[in-house]
């Protein structure tokens, strides 16, 4: 599901919500979540899952084209862990 599909589904499910308002709400939620991760905060949405940052240490990688060794710097990457309720719902549905 894309962001625009999510906005369309919200507008369809809640007729009192104009598509423009649904668009604004989704953008504000995603912006708030992004800002929290940039600050290093953990985001927990009960029943859905949590977002946190994982540290990836520096390593030596390989250029797949030439095979030469390449230094890959350390970095922080966003990580999502599905909550128990979400895992169970997906498992039952599939």
UniProtKB/Swiss-Prot annotation:
One GO CC term on file: cytosol
Cross-referenced Gene3D superfamilies: IHF-like DNA-binding proteins (4.10.520.10)
KW Transmembrane helix (keyword) present: no
Listed transmembrane segments: none
Record-linked Pfam families: Bac_DNA_binding
GO biological process: DNA recombination; regulation of DNA-templated transcription; regulation of translation
GO MF terms held by the record: DNA binding; structural constituent of chromatin
PANTHER family to which the protein is assigned, alphabetical: DNA-BINDING PROTEIN HU, INTEGRATION HOST FACTOR SUBUNIT BETA
Main function: This protein is one of the two subunits of integration host factor, a specific DNA-binding protein that functions in genetic recombination as well as in transcriptional and translational control.
NCBIfam families: hip, PRK00199.1
Complex formation: Heterodimer of an alpha and a beta chain.
Family: Belongs to the bacterial histone-like protein family.
Protein name (database record): Integration host factor subunit beta
Organism: Dechloromonas aromatica (strain RCB)
């Amino acid at each position: 599901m894309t962001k625009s599909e999510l906005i369309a589904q919200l507008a369809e499910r809640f007729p009192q919500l104009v598509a423009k308002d649904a668009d604004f709400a989704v953008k504000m939620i995603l912006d708030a979540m992004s800002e929290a991760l940039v600050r290093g905060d953990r985001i927990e949405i009960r029943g859905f899952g949590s977002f946190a940052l994982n540290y990836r240490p520096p390593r030596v990688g390989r250029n797949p084209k030439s095979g030469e060794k390449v230094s890959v710097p350390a970095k922080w990457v966003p990580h999502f862990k599905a909550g128990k309720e979400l895992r169970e719902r997906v498992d039952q549905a599939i």
